[in-house]
């Protein structure tokens, strides 16, 4: 595929386009935080990004989100765009992020593009400490231990009624990319049509109210694909690369949500009086706002250092470590922002309560902080 390298002028123009979309169309649709966007509205807004070229669902790479992760300016665009979208709607940003990654994988493997999704978790998380060994073996050729092989084959099996995968997305999609790990083949990718799957809509677990958790499993009698979609030696590299981009995207979306919560709290503290002075002049409020601001700025600094594509386990482990450290801080920042508003901060029409729930939900996607820490620790033992 021919690469489309961005110039700094291209980057500025694309970011301006996303900013304008977020401040107008997306802001209008999310003006009432206690009333999540209906799926039809969310899908229509995704369609606008497709029309603008911000999201690319064609079979040729262009300048859309995650079109060329080898281009540092394209990575910078993706991260800034996701932050901008998340400032208005973290759930919308997450949908766009996952859809862009699925389109990237489709283009990379020569598969048709479309309203695809990609799942980058097993049926029970990441496989804990077994995951790094399988990825290291991809690069070094080292054999996977029998214990790790058994754990990975269980966690990353094809979705069944007993071991389903979970998709958090809009309800209308046609195909989903599923990675599996098989003892005799290692990493494999399967592009499964919705018609071959049982899709069960679930109740909202916590945050990202714009999207629907969906439990997916193969229909009875459906024979899994006999051949891998992409060559065996490429499958694990695709998993390594997409896992890194997925984590980088979450590291962009969560600060966008926390920054919005902080902005609401800062504005409130600058107008609310208690005992005479504005509450921003009270030490307790200043402490809450200061700590929340530190967490958001720390996340910004960390994100600026993650523009390199994940071509090795070491680089992916860096993202695991950043996520494990930063997601709890960003959740705390959103919580501190909510506390500044006092009792009304818990009211859903204020918006901060939803942003806190969104941050909490983002913390658990793609591995909890505890599991990411375990994976990082295991990587250190292997190299």
Show where each model-derived region lies.
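Short amphipathic alpha-helical face segments that pack within enzyme cores
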Residues: 76, 80, 100-104, 253-260, ...
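Glycine-rich phosphate/cofactor-binding loops in nucleotide/flavin-utilizing enzymes
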Residues: 3-4, 341-383
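Amphipathic alpha-helices that form helix-helix packing interfaces
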Residues: 251, 258-261, 265, 292, ...
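Glycine-rich flavin
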Residues: 36-191, 195, 375
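Glycine-rich beta->alpha junctions and the first turn(s) of the following alpha-helix
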Residues: 5-7, 14, 203-296
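Charge-rich, acidic-biased intrinsically disordered regions
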Residues: 36-47, 280-286, 313-326, 345-361
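C-terminal helix-coil-helix/basic helical segment that borders enzyme active sites and/or dimer interfaces
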Residues: 27-37, 62, 296-327, 338-346, ...
């Amino acid at each position: 595929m021919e690469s489309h390298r961005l110039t700094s002028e291209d980057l500025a123009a694309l970011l301006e386009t996303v900013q304008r979309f977020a401040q107008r169309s997306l802001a209008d649709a999310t003006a009432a935080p206690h009333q999540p966007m209906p799926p039809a509205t969310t899908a229509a807004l995704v369609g606008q990004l497709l029309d603008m070229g911000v999201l690319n669902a064609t079979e040729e790479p262009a300048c859309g989100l995650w079109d060329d992760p080898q281009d540092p300016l394209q990575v910078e665009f993706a991260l800034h765009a996701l932050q901008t979208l998340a400032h208005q709607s973290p759930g919308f940003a997450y949908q766009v992020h996952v859809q862009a990654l699925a389109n990237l994988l489709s283009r990379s493997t020569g598969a048709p593009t479309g309203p695809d999704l990609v799942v980058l978790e097993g049926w029970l998380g990441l496989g804990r400490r077994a995951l790094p060994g399988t990825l290291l073996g991809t690069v070094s050729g080292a054999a996977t231990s029998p214990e790790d092989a058994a754990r990975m084959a269980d966690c990353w099996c094809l979705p069944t009624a007993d071991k389903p995968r979970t998709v958090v997305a809009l309800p209308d999609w046609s195909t989903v990319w599923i990675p599996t790990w098989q003892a005799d083949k290692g990493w494999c990718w399967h592009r499964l049509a919705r018609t071959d799957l049982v899709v069960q809509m679930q109740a909202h677990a916590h945050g990202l109210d714009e999207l629907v958790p969906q439990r997916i499993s193969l229909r009875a009698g459906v024979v899994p694909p006999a051949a891998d979609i992409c060559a065996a030696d490429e499958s694990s590299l695709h998993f390594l690369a997409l896992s890194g981009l997925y984590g980088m995207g979450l590291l962009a979306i969560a600060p966008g949500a926390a920054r919005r919560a902080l902005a609401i709290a800062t504005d409130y503290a600058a107008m609310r009086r208690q005992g005479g002075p504005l509450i921003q002049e009270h030490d307790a409020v200043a402490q809450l706002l200061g700590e929340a601001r530190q967490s958001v700025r720390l996340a910004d600094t960390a994100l600026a250092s993650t523009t390199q594509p994940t071509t090795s386990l070491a680089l992916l482990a860096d993202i695991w470590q950043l996520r494990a450290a930063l997601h709890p801080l960003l959740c705390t920042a959103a919580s501190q922002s909510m506390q500044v508003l006092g009792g009304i901060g818990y009211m859903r029409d204020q918006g901060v309560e939803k942003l806190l729930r969104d941050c909490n939900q983002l913390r658990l996607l793609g591995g909890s902080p505890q599991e990411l820490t375990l994976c990082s620790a295991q990587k250190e033992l292997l190299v």
